[in-house]
Amino acid sequence: STFGNGVEATVLNETGGREVLINDKLSAHQAYILALYRHRPELINRMKAIADYYSNKHASATGSIGDHVMILNTGSIKNVRIGDYCHICGTCRLSNGSVNSNVTAPVHIGHGVICDDFIISSGSEVDDGTMLTRCFVGQACKLGHNYSASDSLFFSNCQGENGEACAIFAGPFTVTHHKSTLLIAGMFSFMNAGSGSNQSNHMYKLGPIHQGTMERGAKTTSDSYILWPARVGAFSLVMGRHVNHADTSNLPFSYLIEQRNTTYLVPGVNLRSVGTIRDAQKWPKRDKRKGPNRLDYINYNLLSPYTIQKMFKGRSILKDLKRVSGETSEIYSFQSAKIKNSSLNNGIRFYEIAIHKFLGNSIIKRLEGINFQSNEEIRQRLKPDTEIGTGEWVDMSGLIAPKSEIDRLLDGIENGSVNRLKSINASFAEMHENYYTYEWTWAYNKIQEFYGLNPDEITAQDIICIVKTWKEAVVGLDKMVYDDARKEFSLSSMTGFGADGSHDEMKQDFEQVRGDFESNTFVTAVLKHIEDKTALGNELIKRIESIQD
């Protein structure tokens, strides 16, 4: 037996063609390449050969049980390798799999669980009647309450309860809690599924052949529905039923709302949502992985070259729509979606605010803590440390990296110079560690393009001008978030409080349960953020304003 290693999970396309060979060392980024880069057949063949080599190397005629393992009231365990300190209690059936438990991150498998052809990584809990067939479960995942999944991959910190998954690629922090939720043939990450969220990959023609992508941070509301194929942009919110196959990948931070069977797009509006900021803060805190060997390299940044490049594209798409259809049009058409005039103008404004914020952040970070004597010193400091980072960036299910570096790794796999799973993971680790170095190279080029600056002529005054714009953007955005949070304390939010009492009692009941707006921890954090960022900008301006030459 190979104990689950080498099992093919037919992710994304239920009928096959995007199979991922699961193994003990599978990372979200490896799986991303195996599933999506089918336009490079030599690469796929090499990666399959590397995975097969690993599977055969670890094959054995006998299973194994590690040290300090507890197995209690369990039905059948056949062809399974069980790691140290694992707890298996009341489990029905485990067949052909690996449980990669260890002392720092033990695995718990609980009552009524049935797993066939599976791998469960360190620190995970699979409990309460969960059923898995041909599945990979990453580190610190939690599956329970009768969750059922087939041909699916769950990477770090995913949670699945009550519902159902079929052929999904669940990148880090994909969360689904509700009985009525079906995730099928989709790629997700940093995603929260509302109750009754469904997708269809079948149009009753040639079978379940369709697939879709919700980019990082996308969320669905209750009873949302998407007919694949479709692609939803990063950090977007999907509300209602969407059947027209829109691709909003270049319009991130949007709302997709259905009105009378039509998809209406509100671009960029999620940038000012208090929920988006709260999500970005909570993910790093909810990383439950323990131990030194982490399989996935996760970048939590809300604004990165990946999302900002899309905002640049989104801004030009919206400006082109405005130019072609005329400024006075009430409704603009983008692919199969409609955009209202006010939404389009706001979208351009939101994207520009975010671009100012990101580029300003990058400059302030780059010039931090140095007392400059001349403009030439500033120019030298601004010059990037490496040429890597220009061009397009990709989000490989959690890892944000320049496409040039990904291509370099893929070329290495194709020509045979990279031929082990650990070497592939080491390349991802290197990209992750160098993220900020590469990010600055990208930002430096965009600063020149966006602000129309010549790198040999940048002066302290140019920097001061950018920092002032940055300050306006940051404070403006924070004020929008503050106002958005205030809505949660409005009179309509108090509906149902103060049962059987007067208006005053309603307010008192609300304050006892929810607290008051000004002392809310999130609200005070936003106000402190405004204060801190203003001080940060002022400090840089003060440090360089006297430079004249």
Annotate each PLM feature.
Residues 1-62, 249-549:
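Terminal amphipathic alpha-helical/low-complexity segments used for targeting or macromolecular assembly
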Residues 65-72, 77, 82-89:
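Metallocofactor- and cofactor-centric catalytic cores in central/energy metabolism, strongly enriched
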Residues 1-44, 89-90, 99-134, 138-326:
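Glycine-rich hexapeptide-repeat left-handed beta-helix
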Residues 38-41, 57, 67, 72, ...:
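Glycine/serine-rich phosphate-binding loop and adjoining beta1-alpha1 elements at the start
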Residues 55-58, 62, 75, 92, ...:
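Surface-exposed loop/turn motifs in large extracellular/passenger domains
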Residues 62-63, 218:
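Short linear interaction motifs
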